[in-house]
UniProtKB/Swiss-Prot annotation:
GO terms for molecular function: mRNA binding; structural constituent of ribosome. It comes from Rickettsia africae (strain ESF-5). SUPFAM superfamilies: Ribosomal protein L13. This protein is one of the early assembly proteins of the 50S ribosomal subunit, although it is not seen to bind rRNA by itself. It is important during the early stages of 50S assembly. The keyword Ribonucleoprotein applies. The lineage of its organism: Bacteria, Pseudomonadati, Pseudomonadota, Alphaproteobacteria, Rickettsiales. Part of the 50S ribosomal subunit. Gene3D superfamilies: Ribosomal protein L13. Pfam families: Ribosomal_L13. This is Large ribosomal subunit protein uL13.
Length: 155
């Protein structure tokens, strides 16, 4: 029996909408990363973008477990300005309470996707919004009930 390898013309992409309200960040990010890669499909092909389009709403209400949400000594995100001594840091709690809370989910998912051109293409299929509104109603997304799959998914 030959190994099946999908062709780009055979790939069908679905649109999913996930409500992240009171959902644990790491569990959500790992599931979304698998869906963006297409690993939940039987026609998964590693070298093609066979994943689905994911819309995440209420990203500002995602939950962090343990001490990660603590603004003083919680999970720290680093960035570098490019100048000597220019390393900057901020905590996950500050980002979630700040102007762009959707960046926490985007960073978590991005770090679970392969770091190459295919990963960048797959990340372009992720749409994260801080509140409950999204402009993708024309695509008729299917609601993905992530919270009811496992009691540990919700906090």
């Amino acid at each position: 029996m030959k190994t099946y390898s999908a062709k780009p013309s055979e790939i069908e992409k679905k649109w999913w909408v996930i409500d992240a309200k009171n959902i644990v960040l790491g569990r959500l990010a790992s599931r979304v990363a698998n869906m963006l890669r297409g690993k939940h499909k039987p026609s998964f092909t590693p070298h093609l973008d066979c994943g689905d389009n994911i819309i995440i709403i209420n990203a500002g209400h995602v939950k962090l477990t343990g001490k990660k949400a603590n603004p003083k000594d919680g999970k720290i995100y680093y960035r570098y300005t490019g100048f000597p001594g220019g390393i900057k840091d901020t905590t996950a709690g500050k980002i979630l309470s700040g102007k762009h809370p959707e960046r926490v989910i985007k960073m978590a998912v991005k770090r679970m996707i392969t770091r190459n051109a295919l990963g960048a293409k797959q990340m372009s299929n992720l749409y994260v919004y801080a509140n409950g509104d999204h402009p993708h109603m024309a695509q008729q997304p299917t609601v993905y009930d992530f919270a009811s799959q496992n009691p540990k998914n919700k906090k």
